[in-house]
């Protein structure tokens, strides 16, 4: 495997295979590098990519917009604002140094969603897709400007904030991987179960309502799941773009427009 320390592919495969089946692990530095550093990074990267891609596919189906992803709703920018705030204020929990960033990112993601939906409802009682997108874009620009302002006054925290905003999973461990896995199992499972409803949304909200879909609750449920997943991913890996936008379109080349096949393949490709 590639990295600052070269480990032969055979050694990498042997370490992972023996660890999976409880066999005696090879001695040497390669065991520590593979199991302690690189394996959790790879797992976290796979889970984060799959979650972001799944969120993008769900958003594109819900909003009927091929350019939609997590950033369209403004949730990604809100989660980034929460994480930057945690880094700037040094918020942490004993024994879990990353938990402060994660909690703040999730809280700001949910708060952003509530604010965007509230503004959308006040402007349009029907909460049309166009209104939600418009409010999301406006809030995303506002949150990005606040992040720039906080970065300018961050002082000694400038390096850590700048490095985090670039997006990196180099610090991911097994704890972060388990959190990602749990979030993906819960919220991703809900999104996968909404495949038929998203197929109905692709025909328009009125058509979906006539087909028996509870438009309001389904829309709210999908948005909450997307916001939660993005909050977790942003807190672990920083602001990562284009995955939720590009991967769903690549998956459609193989599955077509049916979300019953699109969502699982998007999750796998991500």
Task: Mark where each language-model region is.
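Alpha-helical transmembrane segments in inner-membrane proteins
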Residues: 1-270
């Amino acid at each position: 495997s590639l990295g600052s320390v070269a480990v032969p592919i055979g050694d990498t495969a042997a370490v992972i295979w023996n660890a999976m089946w409880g066999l005696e692990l090879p001695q040497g530095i390669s065991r520590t590098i593979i199991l302690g550093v690189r394996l959790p990074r790879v797992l976290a990267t796979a889970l984060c990519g799959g979650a972001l891609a799944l969120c993008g596919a769900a958003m594109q189906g819900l909003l009927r917009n091929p350019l939609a992803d997590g950033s369209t709703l403004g949730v990604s920018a809100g989660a980034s604002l929460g994480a930057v705030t945690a880094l700037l204020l040094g918020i942490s929990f004993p024994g879990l140094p990353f938990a402060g960033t994660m909690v703040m990112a999730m809280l700001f993601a949910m708060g952003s969603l509530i604010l965007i939906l509230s503004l959308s409802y006040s402007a349009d009682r029907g909460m049309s897709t166009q209104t939600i997108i418009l409010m999301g874009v406006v809030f995303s620009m506002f949150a990005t400007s606040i992040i720039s302002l906080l970065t300018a006054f961050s002082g000694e925290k400038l390096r850590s904030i700048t490095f985090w905003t670039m997006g990196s999973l180099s610090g991911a461990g097994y704890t972060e991987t388990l959190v990602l896995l749990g979030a993906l199992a819960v919220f991703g499972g809900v999104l996968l179960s909404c495949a038929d409803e998203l197929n109905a949304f692709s025909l328009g909200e009125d058509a979906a309502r006539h087909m028996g879909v509870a438009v309001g609750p389904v829309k709210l449920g999908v948005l909450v799941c997307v916001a939660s997943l993005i909050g977790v991913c942003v807190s672990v890996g920083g602001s990562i773009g284009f995955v939720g936008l590009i991967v769903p379109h690549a998956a459609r080349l193989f599955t077509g427009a049916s979300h019953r096949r699109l969502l699982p393949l998007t999750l796998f490709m991500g």
